[in-house]
């Protein structure tokens, strides 16, 4: 990326939107000696982030004109770390236009905004997925309906049969109908490292969702709004398969999307009682589930580095090593 060639590598700054995983990202960046910038969309949000001494600057900007803020980030010698709030609040169009060097495959942000393209990419990678129905007439079992975008489960709903599905789809647009797979949820955290030439299984979590995980006693319809995350240590016999799916996904991104995957990403799945895995979604950037081991380090990071490391630190470590080796352009698009 030509912008990086003009940067002073001794004065790199790391920036991200003040939400989602910003605390983890910026804490890790500061630990590795980078200047840090949090970008808030509201004054009250900015006030919260200003209290942390590992954040050097907090900007308040209008996300509707993020490209202008990105130009200032270039002037500040900053690289940008995308996450779910960036995808949702700024949007893929501005994400593609923003001139600031962005970690990972920038084009993947556009794919992430379309549920059908997400499933296509998983399938192209040879990863087992839940069945997708194009119309209610095809439905012959319970399904879950998901809205497009990184909405943290908001608006998702279950339908037990096609009649219920038709009724609840009235007035909706931009959604996908998926088979509801029975089992337990598991969300796998990966890191694709151009510096070390490998895909790392970094951790896993379970989402804590309102109100499906609450005390509803059957009185209300289940909803799936993510309010937090719970830690998960996977059965070791599952790890080879989970790692393989992560590798296959990284290869699919490079072959289908046309850019190399670099940095954190996530495959979201159900594990059945026969230990088979059905992947129903991906996130092509850091996920909020990595916050469960912020400051402590993930259970698998010690396997790669012989010391605990959280995902924010892992990102900063990769940036530092790439800068030392003259390979920042392998990380940023």
UniProtKB/Swiss-Prot annotation:
Residues 106-313 form the ATP-grasp domain. Disulfide bonds: none annotated. One of its GO terms (biological process) is 'de novo' IMP biosynthetic process. It comes from the Archaea. InterPro entries: ATP-grasp (IPR011761), ATP_grasp_subdomain_1 (IPR013815), IMP_biosynth_PurP (IPR023656), IMP_biosynth_PurP_C (IPR009720), IMP_biosynth_PurP_N (IPR010672), PreATP-grasp_dom_sf (IPR016185). Its cofactor is Mg(2+); Mn(2+). This is 5-formaminoimidazole-4-carboxamide-1-(beta)-D-ribofuranosyl 5'-monophosphate synthetase.
């Amino acid at each position: 990326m030509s912008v990086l060639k003009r940067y002073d590598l001794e004065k790199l700054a790391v920036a991200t939107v003040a939400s989602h995983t910003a605390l983890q990202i910026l804490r890790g960046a500061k630990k590795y000696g980078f200047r840090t910038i949090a970008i808030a969309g509201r004054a009250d949000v900015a006030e919260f982030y200003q209290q942390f001494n590992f954040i050097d600057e907090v900007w308040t900007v209008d996300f509707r004109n993020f490209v202008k803020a990105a130009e200032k980030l270039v002037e500040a010698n900053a690289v940008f770390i995308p996450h779910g709030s960036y995808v949702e609040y700024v949007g893929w169009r501005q994400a593609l236009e923003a001139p600031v060097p962005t970690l990972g495959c920038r084009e993947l942000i556009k794919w992430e905004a379309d549920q059908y393209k997400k499933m296509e990419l998983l399938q192209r990678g040879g990863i087992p997925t839940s069945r997708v129905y194009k119309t209610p007439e095809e439905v012959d079992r319970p399904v879950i309906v998901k809205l497009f975008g990184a909405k943290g489960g908001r608006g998702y709903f279950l339908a037990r049969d096609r009649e219920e599905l038709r009724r609840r789809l009235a007035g909706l647009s931009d959604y996908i109908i998926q088979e509801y797979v029975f089992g337990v949820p598991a969300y796998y955290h990966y890191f694709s490292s151009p510096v070390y030439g490998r895909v790392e299984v970094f951790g896993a979590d379970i989402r804590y969702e309102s109100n499906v995980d609450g005390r509803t006693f059957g009185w209300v319809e289940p909803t799936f709004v993510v309010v937090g995350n719970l830690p998960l240590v996977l059965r070791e016999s599952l790890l080879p398969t989970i790692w393989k799916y992560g590798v296959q996904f990284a290869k699919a991104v490079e072959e289908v999307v046309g850019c190399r995957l670099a940095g954190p990403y996530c495959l979201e799945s159900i594990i059945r009682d026969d230990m088979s895995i059905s992947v129903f979604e991906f996130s092509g950037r850091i996920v909020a589930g990595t916050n469960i081991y912020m400051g402590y380090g993930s259970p698998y990071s010690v396997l790669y580095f012989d010391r605990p490391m959280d995902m924010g630190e892992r990102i900063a470590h990769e940036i530092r090593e790439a800068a030392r080796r003259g390979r920042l352009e392998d990380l940023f698009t």
